[in-house]
From Swiss-Prot:
Names of the cofactor(s): Fe(2+); Mn(2+)
The protein, known as: Mannonate dehydratase
Organism the protein comes from: Sorangium cellulosum (strain So ce56)
UniProt xrefs under HAMAP family: UxuA
Keyword Manganese among UniProt keywords: yes
Length: 357
């Protein structure tokens, strides 16, 4: 298990040199964030990013994310040129030493929250999702959501939502299949594993189709193009926001198939109606048994990449919601502790945290 940490580049309030000081850190997960969606990332930019990361003694082997243009999801004629560009991005990432590319196929909205700074009883601030509040939102009036690279202007949002009114879940699956049949052969050719991130939260929102929500969706995904290069970013927090999703079972099934090149390990406190907030990583803080999840990774012989996911804002830290240093660092060290204990107390090879650099 290679423990990584997301970094948003030189504009990130969290310094790369600080991340390097986290015990057990292997590498950085990052991307080129200032190139418009659908355009090609210059290979020189990727190589420079790799050199910057390696300069502090870490690895850069996972990209998160290469955004998928809406015209691809909508199946519009422009998709062929955009898929060509996406394929070139896969090649360019491979040329810079990238092994895994995370991406998603969520229409319009990326990960969706109603609060960016919910105060918990201990005084920490966290991301939260109120199912009832979302049901009352009219997205056509214009909203800004965390996790976007940019937000739509109200008129742009209305236009793209109108386009999706005629796109059913099955039609979105057809568009995804077309996309996968184009990109997976390229990934195979250059030795990159694609890792689809599930929908977050794992349910339809604002009347938009969502197709990567549960076990059946994940199985359809990996069988659509049956290749080791067609994998999953198994995000415990995203899938875990639906109490029907058994994360331990998902890790055992898809990890046993060798289809989890990348995992997000975080906890989430979920209510029956789908309302949730993002808790500390510790099992007792949320709805997920993180120790059992880590053991499942161990039992399937997982040797891929994981990272702690969204953290709370603690100890007065400010910055990008969900992506501060302190709580994610605590999460990483906790996860490494679970991994070491699991390896030493379970049959199999002794625990080993991969060395950086």
């Amino acid at each position: 298990m290679k423990m990584t940490f997301r970094w948003y580049g030189e504009n990130d309030p969290v310094k790369l040199e600080y991340i390097r000081q986290i015990p057990g850190i292997y590498g950085i997960v990052s991307a080129i964030y200032d190139v418009p969606v659908g355009e090609v990332w210059p290979v020189e930019r990727l190589q420079a990013l790799r050199a910057r990361v390696e300069g502090v003694g870490l690895r850069f082997e996972v990209v998160e994310s290469v955004p998928v243009h809406e015209d691809i999801k909508l199946g519009k004629p422009a998709r062929e040129r955009l898929i060509d560009n996406f394929c070139q991005n896969i090649r360019n990432c491979a040329a810079a030493g990238v092994k895994v590319i995370c991406y998603n196929f969520m229409p319009v909205f990326d990960w969706t929250r109603t609060e960016m700074a919910r105060e918990l009883p201990d005084g920490s601030l966290t991301l939260a999702f109120d199912a009832a509040a979302v049901a009352e939102i009219d997205p056509e009036q214009g909203i800004s959501l965390p996790g976007w690279d940019s937000s739509y202007r109200p008129e742009q949002l209305r236009a793209v939502l109108d386009e999706y009114k005629n796109v059913s879940e099955e039609a979105l699956w057809e568009h995804l299949e077309h996309f996968l049949r184009r990109i997976i052969p390229v990934a195979e050719e250059v030795g990159v594993r694609m890792a689809m991130h599930p929908d977050d939260p794992p349910r339809p929102i604002f009347g938009l189709p969502r197709i990567v929500k549960n076990r059946d969706d994940l199985m359809r995904l990996v069988k659509t193009v049956d290749s080791p290069a067609n994998g999953i970013t198994l995000c415990s927090g995203s899938l875990g926001a639906d109490l029907c999703n058994n994360i331990v079972s998902l890790v055992r099934e898809f990890g046993g198939m060798g289809r989890i090149p990348f995992g997000h390990l975080r906890n989430v406190a979920v209510q029956e109606d789908g309302t949730f907030f993002e808790s500390a990583h510790l099992s007792c803080e949320g709805s997920l048994d993180m120790a059992a999840i880590v053991k499942a990774y161990h039992d399937v012989g997982f040797d891929g990449y994981v990272r702690p996911d969204h953290g709370r804002m603690i100890w007065g830290e400010t910055g990008k919601p969900g992506y501060g240093l302190y709580d994610r660092a605590l999460g990483l060290v906790y996860l490494n502790g679970l991994w070491e204990a699991t390896c030493k107390l379970s049959p199999g090879p002794a625990a080993k945290v991969p060395a950086p650099g």
